[in-house]
Amino acid sequence: MATFKSLSEADLLAFSTGLIAGVDEVGRGPLVGDVVTAAVILDPSKPISGLNDSKKLSEKRREALFDEICDKALCYQVGRASPAEIDELNILHATMLAMQRAVAGLNIAPELVLVDGNRSPIFVAHNGAELTSHSIIKGDGLIASISAASIIAKVTRDREMDVLDAAYPQYGFAKHKGYPTKAHFEAIAEHGVFDQYRKSFKPVKALLGL
């Protein structure tokens, strides 16, 4: 598995002329909830305009692209790791596990997997063979399939935080999405934590006296 600092779509021909899955994650930093990943195989005959790193897009644009990706992609799949798995494995290994779950859930086997960042887990095809994979630094702004994966993962997790906000409105999840903001710390100090919190994360451990 190689790591690239930059890579163009044309460069992909050096790796594969077949199906390419882009993979990205969201939610490594929050104190609460799953870490969410997505794997997307785009259809070259149905290009999607405006794909980019989800963090650089407005919420309205992400939502519109989410629907377009779901409609036009050959296939996509969300993978996740729970707070309990994060606490057991650590956030890095839980993220790798979630990525593996996303790729394993694709109903079309990719010939190449491209992962945003500087590392990639081992991906295995349905027949047990190891899939070729490469990590690409800032790939979510370089490779369309990774951009699409970042959008699917981001919108999915944000929606889950909205659901959590409806159940626990006193925490403000709809605004901070579970990240360690001042408002979130104040809510934790007043109301404590519940089972969706990541107990291995330092601010939560400190509150629980662990």
Curated annotation (Swiss-Prot):
Keywords: Cytoplasm, Endonuclease, Hydrolase, Manganese, Metal-binding, Nuclease
Residues involved in a divalent metal cation binding: 24-25, 116
Main localization, broad class: cytoplasm
Gene Ontology CC annotations of this record: cytoplasm; ribonuclease H2 complex
Subcellular location: Cytoplasm
Gene Ontology molecular functions: manganese ion binding; RNA binding; RNA-DNA hybrid ribonuclease activity
Cysteine disulfide links: none
Cofactor: how bound: Manganese or magnesium. Binds 1 divalent metal ion per monomer in the absence of substrate. May bind a second metal ion after substrate binding.
GO biological process terms on file: DNA replication, removal of RNA primer; mismatch repair
Keyword Nuclease in record: yes
Domain RNase H type-2, residue spans: 18-210
Official protein name in the record: Ribonuclease HII
